[in-house]
């Protein structure tokens, strides 16, 4: 249905843009054998009337625009009128998130053509038949009626208390309820933690290969992700010498992913101790992504790096997406620990 107000606005705008007068339309109409009077045009200009479709199509053709757009039914086609274009932020120029990039597009194309594709780009247990435990679903259903309002910004007290108890089991030091933040998955909290910390040009040491969200969040926060090597020939462990070489006076933090995504490496205490020593020497924050900490095989034990660094400020991330097979529930958390006295302003920023 034609929108009279939009038609009038666009009609008058086009007259100005094309530097045309009403008499020019009358002349064009006469040349095309279209019956159009001066009083009709005056009504279109004033908004007292909207032309019949055949007249509107003639006017649109004369102006070189789409008739539907002129009637207010859709936007102008590219090239017909100078419309403002909206482009992505330049902050995205150096952001890559390949777990949902061209490779996935190609996989989707293959699926559409009948190829069976196993998608391992994201840690999503559901498509492979791993189901959420019945107890979790039952408790979620039972609690829904009590969750209609907002919680505190850090999350439900009962949930944070349970996470605090888990932190104690992991020997993470100096943790209280107020040091625990729950979020819409760990991804949201990674973004929050980087945005609250970084100024333009600040550097963060990030493993390579890494889970690409870390590099993306550092970049979007105005920082620079400096990648240190995790070498396949050395069990995918971080190259400590490479880490040391890449520390500068702009380095604020180091990220570790343990157990590692995507390599699956589980770092032993000896490696973690060396990373702690580098962080201690250069006064860095340690961000430890431990979302896979309960998916450890072959009798190995996961050690939280925060348990080895009580004198440093550490931020530990984990959640239930992988361990409890509820990725779609979006349950993640972040734990602040260690020497919090040196991070009071940062913690205020998080809040």
At which residue positions do the language-model features occur?
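A short, Lys/Arg-rich alpha-helix, primarily the initiator
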Residues: 1-28
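Short, charged recognition helix plus adjacent turn
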Residues: 19, 71-83
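Conserved PLP-anchoring active-site segment centered on the Schiff-base-forming lysine
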Residues: 196-218
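Short, basic-rich loop-to-helix N-cap that marks the start of a DNA-contacting helix
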Residues: 46-61
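Short alpha-helical DNA-recognition segment
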Residues: 19-43
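N-terminal small-domain helix-loop-helix segment of the aminotransferase-like
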Residues: 84, 93-185, 192
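Conserved core segment of the aminotransferase class I/II
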Residues: 307-351
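Active-site phosphate-binding strand-loop segment of PLP-dependent enzymes
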Residues: 232-300
């Amino acid at each position: 249905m034609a929108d009279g107000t939009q038609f009038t606005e666009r009609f008058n705008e086009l007259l100005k843009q094309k530097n045309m007068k009403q008499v020019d339309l009358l002349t064009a109409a006469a040349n095309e054998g279209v019956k159009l009077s001066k009083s009709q045009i005056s009504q279109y200009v004033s908004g007292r009337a909207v032309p019949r479709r055949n007249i509107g199509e003639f006017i649109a053709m004369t102006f070189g625009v789409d008739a539907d757009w002129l009637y207010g039914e859709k936007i102008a086609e590219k090239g017909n009128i100078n419309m403002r274009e909206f482009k992505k932020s330049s902050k995205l120029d150096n952001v890559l998130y390949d777990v949902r990039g061209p490779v996935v597009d190609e996989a989707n194309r293959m699926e559409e053509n009948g190829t069976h594709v196993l998608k391992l780009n994201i840690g999503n247990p559901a498509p492979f038949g791993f189901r959420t435990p019945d107890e979790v679903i039952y408790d979620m259903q039972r609690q829904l009626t009590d969750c209609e309002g907002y919680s505190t910004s850090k999350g439900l007290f009962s949930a944070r208390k349970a996470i605090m108890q888990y932190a104690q089991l992991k020997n993470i030091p100096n943790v209280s309820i107020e040091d625990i933040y729950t979020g819409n998955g760990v991804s949201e909290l990674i973004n929050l933690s980087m945005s609250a910390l970084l100024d333009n040009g600040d550097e963060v040491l990030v493993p390579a290969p890494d889970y690409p969200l870390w590099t993306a969040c550092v970049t979007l926060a105005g920082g620079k992700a400096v990648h240190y090597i995790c070498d396949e020939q050395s069990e995918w462990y971080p190259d400590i010498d490479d880490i040391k070489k890449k520390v500068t006076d702009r380095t604020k933090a180091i990220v570790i992913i343990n157990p590692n995504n995507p390599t699956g490496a589980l770092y032993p205490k000896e490696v973690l101790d060396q990373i702690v020593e580098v962080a201690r020497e250069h006064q860095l924050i340690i961000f430890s992504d431990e979302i896979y900490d309960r998916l450890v095989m072959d009798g190995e034990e996961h050690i939280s790096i925060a348990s080895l660094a009580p004198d440093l400020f550490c931020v530990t991330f984990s959640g239930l997406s992988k361990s409890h097979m509820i990725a779609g529930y979006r349950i993640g958390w972040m734990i602040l620990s260690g020497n919090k006295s040196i991070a009071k302003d940062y913690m205020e920023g998080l809040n």
